[in-house]
Amino acid sequence: MKALVLGLLRVYRYAISPMLGRNCRFHPCCSEYAQEAVERHGAMRGGWLALKRVGRCHPFHPGGYDPVP
């Protein structure tokens, strides 16, 4: 499961993300955060952390440095 999620993230980061441009308000960007969260915590918990992060990534949030716990 973990390998599948990481593979999907890599496809997004290298095939889709360059076409969309860098729009993330955080550092590291949301896809880097998701990859690190899944590597550290596994597919379930890391995926949940990534979803929470993407939910915070909007124009009304100040953004900034937000490392993976």
Curated annotation (Swiss-Prot):
Xref: Pfam families: YidD (PF01809)
Primary location class: membrane
UniProt-annotated location(s): Cell inner membrane
Membrane protein topology class: Peripheral membrane protein
InterPro entries per record: Membr_insert_effic_factor_YidD
GO CC annotation, single: plasma membrane
Signal peptide: none
Cell membrane is among the record's keywords: yes
Record-linked HAMAP family: UPF0161_YidD
Name the UniProt record assigns to this protein: Putative membrane protein insertion efficiency factor
Species the sequence originates in: Aromatoleum aromaticum (strain DSM 19018 / LMG 30748 / EbN1)
